């Protein structure tokens, strides 16, 4: 791939930002059938203009639209296709679903319940068909109002495959290999359209890779008759096939352990939950050396991620974006704390191969989230740290 200056950015964020209250209110009315598409679109446009201007004023050299056109980051694919076997009237799912509210605890929803595609595990009623390119729509508007490059996030094949009920869809797809091959073809078309429109930085969201170090997730795969090692290799192959042949475009891949969070009833503060546990050690050598993406955006905000030792396995042509700042904790990191952790990481990977970001996005439409003020304080701390470490 030809070099792109965005390959070496020292600062990043993962995509989603805290939705303004007014936008969340319009989203809720739209889901209940009480607001039109036009009203929702106008509210989204207004909020996106504002959040892009704020990112620029806070010193970010790359911006996103905050994912303000999505309920969840996973809609970057599910809203683009038809063919999944989903129940009718799922608009209110986000208001009604039952989530674990216990602080500082593993928290997973019931993936087998009737809900939206990919948010829950759905089969296919027919082969998927592309009906729109939501990331392209997002990029065109974001870049039209931005003074700096706009970054777009797209859900990767691994998560899509993990949330596909293949065993109930064998009359449509021959199995996971057939399904994933089709997903790659669909997403390559979406990416090609983004690149043609001028997008220079595309982030693949791949939270499912940490399933391959998490015992609960591995047991779940095996219970479905799947071979985790085969799934792992298929996903790497698919992620690489997705991005080949787009010179001059920066591709990042984001890996995390889930972005669940809740409110501590004792303190009233936002505190973490999580979906998976396990360090990168067991997958690092294969994953870091086989993926072709220029930027590896890695969650590193808690002990669940393990130490920095696996970074010694990162090839010399990649940047590791350290996700050191928590998006699911009201506690504020300090510049000194972040500099200390970057220094620790640099013992295993040279400082010129490191960058800094939050550990994940700041949350979807139904998430318990930081306040906007808390989010900007955290983003400002990242900017200040980057300026001190890399000048």
Predicted regions mapped to residue ranges:
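Domain-level signal for soluble alpha/beta catalytic cores
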Residues: 1-391
């Amino acid at each position: 791939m030809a070099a792109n200056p965005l390959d070496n950015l020292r600062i990043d964020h993962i995509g989603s930002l805290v939705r303004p209250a007014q936008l969340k209110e319009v989203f809720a009315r739209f889901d209940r059938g009480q607001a039109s598409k036009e009203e929702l679109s106008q509210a989204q446009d207004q909020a996106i203009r504002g959040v892009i201007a704020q990112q620029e004023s806070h010193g970010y050299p790359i911006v996103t639209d905050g994912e303000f056109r999505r309920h969840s980051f996973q809609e970057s694919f599910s809203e683009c296709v038809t063919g999944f076997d989903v129940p009718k009237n799922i608009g209110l799912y986000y208001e009604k679903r039952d989530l674990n509210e216990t602080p500082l605890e593993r928290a997973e929803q019931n993936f087998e319940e009737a809900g939206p595609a990919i948010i829950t595990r759905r089969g296919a009623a027919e082969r998927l068909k592309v009906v729109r390119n939501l990331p392209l729509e997002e990029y065109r508007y974001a870049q039209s109002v931005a003074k700096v490059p706009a970054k777009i996030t797209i859900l990767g094949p691994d998560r899509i495959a993990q949330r596909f009920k293949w065993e109930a869809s064998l009359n449509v797809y021959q199995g996971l290999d057939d399904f994933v091959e089709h997903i790659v073809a669909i997403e390559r078309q979406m990416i090609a359209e983004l690149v043609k429109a001028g997008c220079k930085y595309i982030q693949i969201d791949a939270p499912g890779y940490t399933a391959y170090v998490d015992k609960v997730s591995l047991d779940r795969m095996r219970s479905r008759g799947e071979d985790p090692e085969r799934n792992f290799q298929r996903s790497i192959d698919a992620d690489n096939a997705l991005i080949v042949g787009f010179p001059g475009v920066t591709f990042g891949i984001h890996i995390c352990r889930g972005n669940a969070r809740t409110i501590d009833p004792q303190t009233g503060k936002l505190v973490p939950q999580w979906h998976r546990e396990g360090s990168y050690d067991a997958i690092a050598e294969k994953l870091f050396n086989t993926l072709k993406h220029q930027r590896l955006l890695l969650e590193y905000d808690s002990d669940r991620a393990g130490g920095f030792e696996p970074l010694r396995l990162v090839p010399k042509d990649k940047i590791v974006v350290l996700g050191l700042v928590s998006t699911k904790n009201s506690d504020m990191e300090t510049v000194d704390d972040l500099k200390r952790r970057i220094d620790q990481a640099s013992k295993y990977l040279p400082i010129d191969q490191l960058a800094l970001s939050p550990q994940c996005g700041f949350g979807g439409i139904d998430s318990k989230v930081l306040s906007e003020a808390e989010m900007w304080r955290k983003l400002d701390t990242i900017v200040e740290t980057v300026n001190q470490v890399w000048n």
